[in-house]
Amino acid sequence: MMHSDKYIQALIDSQPFFEVNQENVLGVEMDVFKNRPRSLVDFIELSASHGEKPYLIYQDKVISFDQHLTLVKKAAHILQSQHNVKPGDRVAIYAANCPEWIIFFWATVSIGAIACGLNGWWKGSEAIKAIDAADPNVIVSDQKRFDRIADQVKHPTLIFEDLDLSLYEQELNSFIRIDEDECACLLYTSGTTGTPKGVMTSHRSMIANSTLQMLQGAAVSQHSSSHGIDWSKNTPTSLLTSPLFHVSGLSAGAVTSLFAGSTTLVYDGRFLADKVIKLIQKFSVTSWGG
């Protein structure tokens, strides 16, 4: 990235969106993006401008930004009306990477609640420890992972395979904004030194990470253009192979793609190099992080 430093500084100096100044953040003076969104709700609302452009591609399913926004509103209504989820409450997500994982993440933060991304590789007993500690209003899960906890779980659970959001008629009337330094999600450590711990991640943190990635991407694009490489011919498409319960899959992947208006190709199943290469070629993938 060192070769792009001058392009990064030029963008900071010339583009209001990337302007940086100092602010007091919880008692500490820090460099921040001056004109940043103040809530992940802004990401959701801004996504409407991308209309019918694909946001998520998963197996043979394509979900546009418009469709995603509608599904998020439906999921948020379910959380509010059926499970009394309020700002600060927790919603646990225990599933493999899939569109529903992403939809319920956005639905959760859109009403000021906290998404708890449980490690999808955990055994049932490990998941139960995290669930009991977080005490969510509801768990959303795929069938495979619910089966691991079915005989122990005490919390209400929504199973993705039993839930067809497209058939649900009611939608959230209005999103709920909370302070940018409030928690948006809990992601868990690996547990190499003991029991995995939930790490609080704020709206501010996720917004800053996404904005920084967009800045770096713009700088790399300008650097490439100066060497005769034109990326503008390809539709921005990212390949998501990292788990959504990890910051690389969620914040760097799905969240940034929504903000940037890029298409996210959600990989499913065990990582197979040949399969990945074919997907990259088929969908003309322009970015892949891990």
Where are these regions (language model features)?
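A short helix-loop-beta submotif of the ANL/AMP-binding
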Residues: A76, D89-R90, A96-G124, A133-V138, ...
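Conserved AMP-binding/adenylate-forming core of the ANL superfamily
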Residues: V32-R36, V41, E52-K86, A92-W106, ...
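Conserved pre-ATP/AMP-binding loop-to-beta segment of ANL
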Residues: E52, E171-Y188, G194-T195, S225, ...
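Structural core segment of the AMP-binding/adenylate-forming
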Residues: M1-Q15, W106, S110-R177
